[in-house]
Every structure is written in structure tokens, then in C-alpha cells.
Amino acid sequence: MRHKISLLLFLAACLRVAVAQVESLPPPVVNGNSFEIISNSRYSSHSGFSSALSDTVLSNVLWAMSRVPSLDGSYREFYVATPSNVYLYDPANHVMNVHVAGDRRYRSYSAFEVGIAVERNEEAGLAVQAGLLAGDAFWSRGSGAVASCPMAFAANYANSHWSPNYTINMVDVFGRMSVSGLSDSCVAISSDSTLPRPVTDRADTFEVLLSWLEQDSAFDPAQLPFADVSQLLWAGYGVTPHMPTGKRGLTVPSAVANYYLTRKIYLVRDVGVDRYHNRLPPDTDMATSDHRLEAVTSGDRRDSLRAACPRLPATAPVYIVVCVGDAADDWTMLEPGFVGFQYLMQAHALGLRGRLTAPIAPDERAAIMAALGLPETDRPAIVFAVGEPAAAIVEPRRPENEWLQVARTKEGVRLNVRLAEPGTAKLVVYDLAGRPVRSWGSVRLPAGVHNFEWDGSGDNGTSLPSGPYFGRLYLARMQPSVLTARIDLAR
């Protein structure tokens, strides 16, 4: 009997240790700020932090970094250093598992530090940019308290002190600090009127856009409105009101404000190839602001580009080729990833589809340079294809008299749908991370109003936590469509 009690006590102790090894996180929240105003306002702070940031900020940052598309590497891991431990983040369950015990932060004053380990620096850049914007999304107009900076020295320290399974490419350092906050002031004004002024605040919401972020490879070949092209170019590498170290800041960070991609971004469309500029001629004064195009080659080079890199989507009307000077330099290769995230998010906000092609192999790189007439100093690192969604595979514009609405009830919520014509419908509720949590089987519905009751439980019958969710009603008919509505579940 004594042995049985000892065994039970031992197993209980093991269970307590196992439980202590897992740290739960609060669900991500929706801050309500647009992707554009956050991009226009962001800047990096290197010091002066305090360690007082809420777990909600950490939750949103980790969730955002894990939401970026993979570039088909064999591994991707997120490490978190707090004053307590170093953790390995589990995106599927949104929890942190203790990886190394004890305080191993690079900066003793930081609230937390997040490291990304992937095969390619381009993909690391995608995640780093997502995390930075997720922190800045907590700002308000004119003020903020979440400060951050990607630090290469922190990455070096992490690789020596965090015992990662794979080499950590970069570390985002976060802390609390008074910052200037959100601003929609536009400084990206073309000096020669070759590009219209971009919009620095829109009706979209950063977290909502990110929750549905995905890549596509089938496009309608119709040309894009030029205002959309201008918006994409600005979102990727456009100037902003901030002036770090006397240089005009951009929508993305750059190591020591070196701005490695200056004069190295090219727009490829039906009329020719243009170089994008964000500085006044001759592009050497980094304190200046511009937003213009310079013609490089005339005539349609898109087929030549597709032949040079057959992996590119074949029907995209527009390609943006992001080049670097040194494809072997880690800091340089992070920036195409920063820019790539911006392109994907801005395309999504505009109702467009996009796809990043990376990495670019050396033979593809040389072929692209020859096809587009690029100088030897500009080596393609990422190609972004963008266009309207192909009508054959995604929803067309739905009738104005069709909608999906949400109403609260005593038991939970009621999802009301109005159909202009009959169709087979399937309703799915997703959490903020884009995971399906409750679904109703496909049913044939006539035209008119229909109701779906939801008591807030998942498919397994477990009650789900309060917070934002999204309902999508998929309609299969001659013209398939998708109706979407936000659900605020309250307990």
C-alpha cells in the first residue's frame, strides 16, 4: 500500500512538472487599426524599454508571426525569451512550452524577445515584419506604449544562449516605451506625377486581414487599376513620416537604416518594366521622400519573365521583382521578406490575390535579369505576382441583396443569411487564427432568409472562449460565392 501511495505521489509530482512546462496564452485580440496606418506609422526603437507589457501583446505577436505563409522550408520554429524562461511556441495550440529554464533575454529591460528559425532569411523577414506590425497595432493616434526592434545582436545571443534546435535568423525585441503613435500623414508624394498618392489609412483591420491571409496562383489577366499598383509599391517600400537617425523611414525596417533595396524594386506590366523610387533623384539622400517610376525597358516583358522563371503564376497581370545587391548577406536578404509580407497584406486589403516566389535559384536569377534588362548589381530575390482573383475558382461579386448577419440571443448567436437565389450552403465558424471550430453540413437552401443557431460550442461540444470569430457561408451554385461576417462571442 505504501508503495502504491509513493507511486501516486511520484506520478502527481510528474504531472505538476509537466503542467508547469506549458504556459497558456490569452486569445489574440482585434485592435481595430488598419494595415495601412500601422505601416505608415511604424518605426524601430532600440533601447529605453521597460518589461511591462501584457500577455495579450505577446499573444498577438506570436499569432501574427505564425500566420505568415511558408516558403516551403523543412522547418519553422518560434522561440520566446521572457524574464522567466525561454519557450518554444506551439502555433497549433497557441501555447508556449518551456525550452530552457531561466531568464536568458538579450536585453534585461525587454518585456519579451521572439526569435524565428527558418531555412531562408526571406521567410524570416515575413515573420519579423508581421510581429512588428502586430505590436504596433496596439498604438492609438498620437500615442503608444509597445516598442520593438529586430536586433541581429539579439539573434547572435539567442543562438548561443537559447539552445535552439535550428539556427535563429532574427530576434524581435519588445518592451514598453512611450512612442508617437499612429499617423496617417502622407509624405509619399510623387515628384514627377508618375504615381498617384497612396492611401495611408483605410477601413480594413490588421488582425482580420492577417487571419485570412493566404497565397494564390490563379489570376484574372485583366490589368489592375493604377491606383492599386501605386498602393502596392508604397506598402512594400514606401516612405513614411518617421525620421530615424535623420533618414526618412519606410514602411519596413532596415539594418542600421541602410535601405538595401533602394533602386532595386521593379514593376513589370504590359507596357514595360519600371524601377520604383522612394527618394528624390539621384536617390542618394536618404532624408528625402519620393514616390515615382522610372522607365527601364518598353514593351511587354511578362512572357520573357515567365520563361525565365517557370514557377511564376502564368496569368498574373503584374509582377514586382525585388532585387538585392548581395544575395549572400543575411541582413540584406531579410528585407525582401519584410517587403513580401507588405505586398501580400496590401493585396489582400485591396481585394486582390498575390503570390511570392522565393527563393530564386542562381540560374533563374540570371535569366530574369536578362529577360528584364536589369543591371548586374540587381539580383532578384523575390518575385511577387498580383492580380484580380480568377473568376473560375473564387467568388464573383455577389448580389447586393445577399448577406450574412449576426444577432445575439440568450443562448449564443444567430447567423441570418439572405440568398438571392437557391444554392447548396455550408456554414463554417473560424477562430481568429483561421482554424475551423464549428461547422454545419452542406444543405440545399432556397432563395430567402435562413437562420443558423450557434450556442458558442465547438464541433466537439466544448464551450469556446469569448472573443472574435468569423462565420463564412460557402454557396455552391452556377456562380459560387462566399458570405462572411464577424462574430463577437460573449459569455
Which sequence ranges carry the predicted segments?
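Small-aliphatic-rich amphipathic alpha-helix that forms the alpha element of a beta-alpha
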Residues: 42, 61, 78, 112-157, ...
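A glycine-rich helix N-cap at a beta->alpha junction
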Residues: 159-182, 372-390
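N-terminal amphipathic, basic helical "cap/leader" segment at the start of enzyme domains
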Residues: 21-114, 147, 155-156, 160, ...
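Short proline/glycine-enriched turn/loop motifs at strand-loop junctions of beta-rich domains
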Residues: 419-424
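Short, glycine-anchored, charge-dense loop/turn motifs used at functional sites
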Residues: 430-437, 469
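C-terminal tail/sorting-segment detector
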Residues: 391-401, 406-416, 439, 443-447, ...
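Sec-dependent N-terminal signal peptides
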Residues: 4-14
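Sec/Tat signal peptide C-region and signal peptidase I cleavage site
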Residues: 15-20
